[in-house]
Amino acid sequence: MLVDGKLVCVTGAGGYIASWIVKLLLERGYTVRGTVRNPTDPKNNHLRELQGAKERLTLHSADLLDYEALCATIDGCDGVFHTASPMTDDPETMLEPAVNGAKFVIDAAAKAKVKRVVFTSSIGAVYMNPNRDTQAIVDENCWSDLDFCKNTKNWYCYGKMLAEQSAWETAKAKGVDLVVLNPVLVLGPPLQSAINASLVHILKYLTGSAKTYANLTQVYVDVRDVALGHVLVYEAPSASGRYILAETALHRGEVVEILAKFFPEYPLPTKCSDEKNPRAKPYKFTTQKIKDLGLEFKPIKQSLYESVKSLQEKGHLPLPQDSNQNEVIIES
């Protein structure tokens, strides 16, 4: 679908997910205004190198708490992708920009009379509930338990939930068409040069800094599928509410087994840090809602392989001396 000339804003455009959203939007013919902390910072050069960026991408300095700057950037746009969010577990530095930032962006979108706002939330706003039946299927109707997140000092999930609630409340009050994406842990090759938080636990296994793996199960999704999910819900007139983005659940032991198969030269751990308790089981989830819009998820094995290749290419992970550089056939 090509939509030449349509103008959209992407907040936090230099981020892991946002960079792929910008890339996809440019490929589909959109004109993009991206907000970043500093438009001249070399760390945003990867955006300028994207196909179509020279003609249809401009970068703007707009802090999440600078309402006037947000209004100026969003004015004239047909839609907004609000992906910017602080990645920290420090409540003092995270909560205000996450919550008020969501409010300010939607306020600015309402003022500009945009067609739709697509908001990047998280599975952290969905599944953190100790009272949920372990056999129950997690879907878009589920919400995390705010008190549980606060009492366990899970400030990331706490902040994501407050920010999403703020977004819904503001959108309702202002009459803004809001659609929310709730991705799980995101993997896949980054476009930016800096390593992002979600790839750190992969890197620590490969470098040998982690001698064991945790008795932990997580659900994963590819960053390119997350980006496509954002664009699909923006373009589909019928899209509404929340959308979980998730491909498959893996125990950390399965993650290191997959990595060891693809990259046996690295000192990957072979033991679990918790050998007393039963192996952690994943929660059950459904992604039928986003699949109904046409999204087909990439296998996470492919995401893991391409994540590591990208870490090698960007210099975050040294190439083993005896590395076999032949391409690997990835079975789904």
Swiss-Prot record:
Disulfide bond sites: C149-C157
Presence of keyword Oxidoreductase: yes
Any Pfam family the entry gives: Epimerase
Keywords from the named record: Disulfide bond, NADP, Oxidoreductase, Plant defense
The organism of origin for this protein: Arabidopsis thaliana
Protein name, as recorded: Cinnamoyl-CoA reductase 2
Residues involved in NADP(+) binding: 12-18, 37, 43, 63-64, 83-85, 156, 160, 183-186, 198
Key word Disulfide bond present: yes
InterPro entries per the UniProt record, alphabetical: Epimerase_deHydtase, NAD(P)-bd_dom_sf, NAD(P)_dehydrat-like
Family of this protein: Belongs to the NAD(P)-dependent epimerase/dehydratase family. Dihydroflavonol-4-reductase subfamily.
Induction: By the bacterial pathogen X.campestris.
One GO biological process term: phenylpropanoid biosynthetic process
